[in-house]
């Protein structure tokens, strides 16, 4: 059942499905608007919208701290990314934050991405160009989360932020500051970063440039 703060992308993300499949099974069309209390089918034969509804434990959304334009500009000018922004032609990925890699991709161990330790308030950057499809706190365990849709295949997620500098629907370019690192939903300051390909988690280190 859809709850306040849910979106098609967060629901699909939580259960490990491709958002396009969830949209198809439920006859949803862009921009995929959901109603609170709506029941969604989350599995079944791809040839028709059938399956079983799933009851999920979703935290109620909190207000999203938004950094002011002046603060965002100041952050961008005082911090320099370790990688250059990708061109539209190459579509390359870049590291989303500076810091120490403290956790690697280990889906069997419960980690669908990597964790980068850093300082509170340090910039978090879009790993590639795309569009912000979610910014909020509605997904348990991720704190203040941003999800970016890069194309029909790839999504990326940036979790545990202190504040965001973008809004849902905003286009972003690779290297653009999208948030401030924090520890919302975590015990220490870190960025949890994930990449999903066709709805499935993949190892970000297979896509990011080698350090």
Functional labels for PLM-detected ranges:
Residues 1-147, 151, 163, 167-177, ...:
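Extracytoplasmic low-complexity/disordered linkers and repeat tracts associated with LysM-containing
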Residues 209-211:
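Short, solvent-exposed mixed-charge patches
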């Amino acid at each position: 059942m859809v709850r306040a703060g849910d979106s098609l992308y967060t629901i699909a993300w939580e259960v490990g499905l491709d958002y396009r499949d969830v949209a198809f099974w439920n006859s949803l069309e862009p921009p995929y608007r959901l109603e609170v209390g709506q029941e969604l089918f989350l599995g079944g034969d791809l040839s028709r919208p059938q399956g079983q509804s799933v009851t999920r434990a979703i935290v109620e959304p909190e207000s999203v701290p938004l950094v002011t334009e002046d603060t965002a500009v100041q952050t961008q000018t005082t911090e320099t990314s370790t990688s250059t922004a990708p061109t539209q032609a190459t579509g390359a990925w870049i590291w989303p934050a500076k810091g120490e890699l403290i956790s690697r991709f280990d889906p069997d161990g419960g980690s669908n991405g990597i964790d980068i330790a850093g300082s509170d308030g340090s910039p978090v950057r879009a790993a590639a160009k795309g569009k912000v499809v979610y910014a909020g706190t509605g997904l348990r365990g991720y704190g203040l989360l941003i999800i970016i849709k890069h194309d029909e295949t790839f999504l990326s997620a940036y979790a545990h932020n202190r504040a965001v500098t973008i809004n849902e629907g905003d286009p972003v370019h690779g290297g653009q500051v999208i948030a401030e690192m924090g520890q919302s939903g975590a015990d220490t300051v870190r960025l949890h970063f994930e990449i999903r390909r066709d709805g499935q988690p993949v190892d970000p280190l297979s896509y990011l440039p080698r350090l």
